[in-house]
Amino acid sequence: MEIQRTANAGVLLKMDGVSILLDGLCDPVGEYLPTTADIAKQLLDNPPDALAFTHYHADHCSEALLLPYRKKNLRPIYGPESLPLGTVKIGEVTITPVESRHLGKTEPNLQHVSYILQGTKCVWFVGDAAPQQWKNRTDLPKPDVLIAPYAYANTLSTWNMVGSLTKQVVLVHLPPRETDQYGLWNAVEKTTEDRGNLSLWIPQMGEILSI
């Protein structure tokens, strides 16, 4: 399985011969990195089999970068509105949307879904979902790999909860160190000093992980 970071909080996931772009096209927002022109071209030259978005904030979904797919590609585009309940199968990979609550309390009515992708491995892509809501979700399959924002690793209580879910974490939604005005990197590094048997990756933009 390959995971390439293509956006602030998004990745291109390749598993079992299927490629799925998850929140993988974004605009510049504050200190967070946008999808670069080179990555946008790479994705258009080799389009993924599907695109999925957890919500439509600009740091997770770029309307401008999404437009060429809607104009030129016949592949289905999946997002919160088109996947409210059911599971979709693409090749040997199933994608199950799970209704989830966005971090914080500023937008209580914001539509947000997370995705469970199952093939030879089970991957959770949670978007900006608040972490504590997963604590007692015994109805969901446990992930082999969790792809999550920095908020899943900036407090010990949350990090311990993550450790009860999975042993492999890919952390996204972190700004570059040089523009990190809120100390997010310091909080994450302090929290994750003792990783136990947890494997943690924090990929750079464009970096490809083989897991």
Question: Which sequence ranges carry the predicted segments?
Answer:
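Active-site environment of divalent metal-dependent phosphoester hydrolases
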Residues: 28-29, 56-61, 83-88, 103-105, ...
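Active-site-proximal loop/helix segments of hydrolase catalytic cores
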Residues: 104-164
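Active-site neighborhood of phospho(di)ester-bond hydrolases with catalytic His/Asp-centered motifs
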Residues: 21-24, 47-63, 78-80, 124-129, ...
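Short, conserved loop/helix-junction motifs that constitute active-site signature segments
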Residues: 43-46, 67-73, 138-142, 160-166
